[in-house]
């Protein structure tokens, strides 16, 4: 397996990216914190978002000292604690970063929401944080529950669109409000019409909360969800989970990077999506003991699995090429008025 690529001074874990097709360059956005905080686990509560670039995930240009804090908590804003995993997309007039954060004064300080930041320059070291706060609602747990195996989950947004439906969808790592404690991990689905996207980004219009993409009743957490196309026509819903939270009947408790095949995602009438929310037929793409977590499939590299090194930190290729293909993540025709 290829070596982990380390930042010269920071501990690095979850990442997401935008691929510049003209330059053939990956813009990586990554969580990072002081290495001195790792042993105590406090790095999760001091994380900011950094920016780096790479041609192939074999070598990474980490930029200068300003590059590891391009997005960080803002005093006086609801996102006043550490920043957690997100997604980045290009729109006609710039770039949007969907991210996870918390209001430290709310509940136990661990209640999460999705926020949005904007820049017109992907190389910028200062993103403009919008006031938008997308909170958990509908069937999804709104705060931590006493006795649960893990705290609240409403994080790790992943966006795609179906142009034929004029709809934009967002997946979110979540928990069911009425699920069994310790088995309530789920993947939420939200949507908004193309015409309302700009208003939804600025908080002037609401997202529609749909039934979960997955609510199998056998995971405490289903983190960093993503959706891809399989070359043979199905779709693959992927996510990460730790072995100690994996109670699925088909995975032997291995945890790690897993997937669920969705055979008929697209309805013939092109109205909505047909997930398999109760299916327990998960496959392990890479078990936790391979020491990669919060993995992403990189369609531009033959669907190779890339994640962060859960032992040493840093970003590492797996050498495993799934051949999974990207959903439509082209938002370049949409103008967002910020």
Regions found by a protein language model. Give the residues of each.
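Carbohydrate-active catalytic/glycan-binding domains of CAZyme proteins
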Residues: 1-338
């Amino acid at each position: 397996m290829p070596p982990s690529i380390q930042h010269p001074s920071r501990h690095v874990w979850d990442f997401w990216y935008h691929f510049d097709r003209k330059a053939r360059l990956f813009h990586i956005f990554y969580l990072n914190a002081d290495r001195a905080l790792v042993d105590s686990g406090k790095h999760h509560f001091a994380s900011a978002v950094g920016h780096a670039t790479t041609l192939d995930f074999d070598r990474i240009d980490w930029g200068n000292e300003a590059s590891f804090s391009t997005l960080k908590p803002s005093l006086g804003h609801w996102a006043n604690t550490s920043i957690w995993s997100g997604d980045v997309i290009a729109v006609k007039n710039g770039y949007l970063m969907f991210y996870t954060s918390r209001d430290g004064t709310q509940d136990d300080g661990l209640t999460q929401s999705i926020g949005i930041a904007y820049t017109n320059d992907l190389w910028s070291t200062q993103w403009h944080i919008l006031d938008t706060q997308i909170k958990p609602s509908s069937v999804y747990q709104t705060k931590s529950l006493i006795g649960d195996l893990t705290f609240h989950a409403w994080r790790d947004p992943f966006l795609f669109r179906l142009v034929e439906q004029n709809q934009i969808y967002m997946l979110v790592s979540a928990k069911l409000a009425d699920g069994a404690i310790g088995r309530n991990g789920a993947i939420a689905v939200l949507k908004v019409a193309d015409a309302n996207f700009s208003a939804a980004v600025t908080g002037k219009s609401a997202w529609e909360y749909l039934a979960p993409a997955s609510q199998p009743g056998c995971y405490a957490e289903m983190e960093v969800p993503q959706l891809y196309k399989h070359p043979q026509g199905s779709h693959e819903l992927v996510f990460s989970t730790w072995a100690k939270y994996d109670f699925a009947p088909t995975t032997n408790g291995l945890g790690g990077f897993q997937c669920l095949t969705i055979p008929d995602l697209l309805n013939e009438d092109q109205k909505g999506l047909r997930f398999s929310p109760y299916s327990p037929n998960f496959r392990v793409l890479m078990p936790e003991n391979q020491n990669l977590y919060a993995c992403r499939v990189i369609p531009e590299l033959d669907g190779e699995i890339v994640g962060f090194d859960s032992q040493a930190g840093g970003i590492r290729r797996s050498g495993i090429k799934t051949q999974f293909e990207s959903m439509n993540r082209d938002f370049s025709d949409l103008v967002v008025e910020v």
